[in-house]
Amino acid sequence: MTMLRAGAVGYVVKGDSTDEILSAIYRTVQGKSSVPERLAAPVASAMLEHIQGLRDATRTRQLQRERVERAIEDRAFRIVFQPIFDLESGKVAGMEALTRFSDLPERPPNVWIAEAEAAGMLLDLELVLAKAALDQLEDLPSDTFLSLNLSPETAVSDRAQRLLEVADPSRIVVELTEHAPVADYDELRESLSGLRERGVRLAIDDAGAGFASLRHIVRLDPDMIKLDITLTRRIERDPVRQALAVALVSFANQVGATVVAEGVETELQLEALRAAGIRFAQGFLLGSPGPLPTAEPDQPPEELCR
């Protein structure tokens, strides 16, 4: 089916009507002595269906690219920050930079990221968002860090390396997300070594959500391990989740890493996380994502004082 004559290919390339494409393919198939007459029409239809699928996929990617390009050019997004609290001191230890898109269609950030990846623009979008967050670094209290979500391919790019050359790299945490499987961990680790030597810390997101995150932890030796929200949910009444959290804290202590619990929404969850030995946490109970405050709150959230 891959041996199309020039006539059929010409119709496909020019983008003529479906009937014209089908006729061209049919004539091509009829001209093949190896194709019986009774099969010419079915073969032509199958080829047309395949070609239409390719054209639809190409058009979809083009629309995705245009949407992402428009969002970047129009800056149709805003950076919000969610505080990460030290549960012992009750103070803000850091801020995670998150994104809210204002461009239509209204969709969650993970959909925009997936679309950017499909359109081949993940690097461009992630770097624009990272720069927008870094531009506000000086508004953070000097003793807090800024956590940026980057895919592995973006984090190791030359453009990201240049972007992260800030005055105090020890205040930057690169939170690795995974949109595609990592092909070579040794290469990734080596590529990240330059950032880490300058003081940038590495965090692994979604720990406990699946095998991929655990593989990240084992192969990349992170400074921070972020407990996935699926483990935080119901941890107050699930002995299995509690045991996993305790084990993760024990592992982190032995390798010199820190565990951060995500998605804390109730006081019972907070109590269970504390009981497991987790020192850092974030979630709607403690602070919702929003514009960066100009100064650290004078008082910690009431929930941390109990």
Predicted regions and their residues:
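Short, flexible helix-to-coil linker/hinge segments that flank and couple to helix-turn-helix
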Residues: M1-R5, G15-R55
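C-di-GMP signaling machinery
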Residues: S45-R78, E115-L122, T294-R306
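Aromatic/hydrophobic pocket-lining residues that form π-stacking "cages" and hydrophobic walls in ligand
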Residues: A24, W112, A133, L248
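Active-site core of bacterial EAL-family cyclic-dinucleotide phosphodiesterase domains
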Residues: A57-E115, Q282, G287-P291
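A generic structural signal for well-ordered alpha-helical segments
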Residues: M3-L4, T28, I72, A116, ...
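EAL-family c-di-GMP phosphodiesterase catalytic domain
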Residues: E88, F101-L104, P152, E175-D184, ...
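Catalytic core of bacterial c-di-GMP phosphodiesterases, primarily the EAL and HD-GYP domains
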Residues: M121-L188, G263
